[in-house]
Amino acid sequence: MTNMRKNHPLMKIINHSFIDLPTPSNISTWWNFGSLLGLCLGIQIITGLFLAMHYTSDTLTAFSSVTHICRDVNYGWIIRYLHANGASMFFICLFLHVGRGIYYGSYTYSETWNIGILLLFAVMATAFMGYVLPWGQMSFWGATVITNLLSAIPYIGTDLVQWIWGGFSVDKATLTRFFAFHFILPFIIAALVMVHLLFLHETGSNNPTGIIPDADKIPFHPYYTIKDALGFLLLISLLLTLVLFSPDLLGDPDNYTPANPLNTPPHIKPEWYFLFAYAILRSIPNKLGGVLALILSIAILAIMPLLHTSKQRSMMFRPISQTLFWILVADLLTLTWIGGQPVEHPFTIIGQLASFLYFFLILVLMPACSLIENKLLKW
């Protein structure tokens, strides 16, 4: 009898991707975050689908419909908070996944890396539009401020903003289209994930040493399915702890006030996972310059393969590069803190210095340091 797992057209794809996949024997827990991101996406799509059954994308009833979900729908409160805090978990896993890619030189698989950057942009766009849907104060003003940035584009800026708004301000048309895009984008993300995995399986996974591991590979199942299952358990435990004990910890109290175009909140700020980019945006006095810096803060990842000057792939055996990497991490945490602070002294100057350091580290210091390490190792 033929083995169905290896011969059936559909099962064969699953088998080659998750069961008989040759995997490096030494990949660490840092390689768990890809599967955890898949879990997060699954949680977000399922909880989002149930929320969409009860949500109404109308400016008059959106806020009330979210309240109705929490108060009247069976287990609506847990679905809503799983979705809201699931987004935070998604971004924690994303940042760790990208950080691992930078540290271990995974960006040298340029196709996989570039699809990953597209995924990052798509997830950020989805999260931004999702934040607008409850139609609280921060939803409305966040949407107004961020969409208004497009007006900085010369000549077509104002027309572009009004086209996105569907009128002369953020209103019913904006909310309806944001809901439509927020619903469809996760499925586009799921398709991009398939492409991401397709390119990854063309080359095989990287590993902590950065050395080609063809001589020492093991099947994905059962070794890494068990390892991923432990990650799933920890992630779900963390998410449920957050949802059941402190569901509003990462949210903004202003979003419990219905949107009011006549009353501006004292500090307009996005969700915590956008604060680093928001700090970079605010640190440049010129509007167009700020918008460009905001886009470049993520797009800069695309030129990382070009900036790789080291003869070694991974940072595992490069202590100077490791130091710079952890300075970059500290810098991003500083930017996240600054993004949540008011625009006043000393936060302004700290934000400007941290923004400069972010680009200087990636564009100048890290490539220069790699060249120095090559000399020290006589490579």
From Swiss-Prot:
Binding annotation for a ubiquinone: H201
Cofactor: heme b
GO molecular function, one term: metal ion binding
GO biological process terms, semicolon-separated: mitochondrial electron transport, ubiquinol to cytochrome c
Stored Pfam families: Cytochrom_B_C, Cytochrome_B
Binding site for heme b b562: H83, H182
Domain of life: Eukaryota
Membrane topology: Multi-pass membrane protein
Alphabetized UniProt keyword annotations: Electron transport, Heme, Iron, Membrane, Metal-binding, Mitochondrion, Mitochondrion inner membrane, Respiratory chain, Transmembrane, Transmembrane helix, Transport, Ubiquinone
Cofactor note text: Binds 2 heme b groups non-covalently.
First-listed, main subcellular location of the protein, grouped into a coarse class: mitochondrion
Entry GO CC: mitochondrial inner membrane; respiratory chain complex III
Binding site for heme b b566: H97, H196
InterPro entries linked: Cyt_b/b6_C, Cyt_b/b6_C_sf, Cyt_b/b6_N, Cytb/b6-like_sf, Cytochrome_b, Cytochrome_b_C_euk/bac, Cytochrome_b_N_euk/bac, Di-haem_cyt_TM
Transmembrane domains' residue ranges: 33-53, 77-98, 113-133, 178-198, 226-246, 288-308, 320-340, 347-367
Subcellular location field: Mitochondrion inner membrane
Subunit structure: The cytochrome bc1 complex contains 11 subunits: 3 respiratory subunits (MT-CYB, CYC1 and UQCRFS1), 2 core proteins (UQCRC1 and UQCRC2) and 6 low-molecular weight proteins (UQCRH/QCR6, UQCRB/QCR7, UQCRQ/QCR8, UQCR10/QCR9, UQCR11/QCR10 and a cleavage product of UQCRFS1). This cytochrome bc1 complex then forms a dimer.
Entry similarity comment: Belongs to the cytochrome b family.
Additional observations: Heme 1 (or BL or b562) is low-potential and absorbs at about 562 nm, and heme 2 (or BH or b566) is high-potential and absorbs at about 566 nm.
Function (record text): Component of the ubiquinol-cytochrome c reductase complex (complex III or cytochrome b-c1 complex) that is part of the mitochondrial respiratory chain. The b-c1 complex mediates electron transfer from ubiquinol to cytochrome c. Contributes to the generation of a proton gradient across the mitochondrial membrane that is then used for ATP synthesis.
Name this protein carries in UniProt: Cytochrome b
